[in-house]
Amino acid sequence: MDQAVLKAAQAALAGEHAAVYGYGVAGGHLDGARAGQAKEAYEAHRARRDALERTVRDLDGRPVAAAAGYRLPFPVTDPDSAVRLAAELESRLAGVYADLVGAATGALRGEAAAALREAAVRSVRWQGDGVAFPGLAERAAPAAPSSPAARP
């Protein structure tokens, strides 16, 4: 068994546990179409979580359990903060799925890539804009030198 694959699968599973919790919080502050989006995302993350539990077992691992509660990145008190939370959940999941894509091969890599794509699409739906490479930390481009380095 490849420990890197198992570790990445466990991280994705932990991310899905957090997403299920987070969407439970966010959904309580949304109504109408946004509440419907949150419910769909909640169900999708439950399904991914269940699939990842099977994957971890198939990798001879013991699936990481959900925490009793999760620290939210900011207070969620209204629809705007609930939408921000949903976008944050998806962005974080894109990161763990990018790691799983990098570690896995074959069918698991394909499943992780599909989950990464879905998280990126949901993130854009929640926040209205996307990033060039979902799941990869945005890095500032190095500054170009304005003049050649001085030579001794």
Model-predicted segments: where are they?
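All-alpha RGS (Regulator of G-protein Signaling) helical domain and cognate RGS-like helical scaffolds
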Residues: 1-152
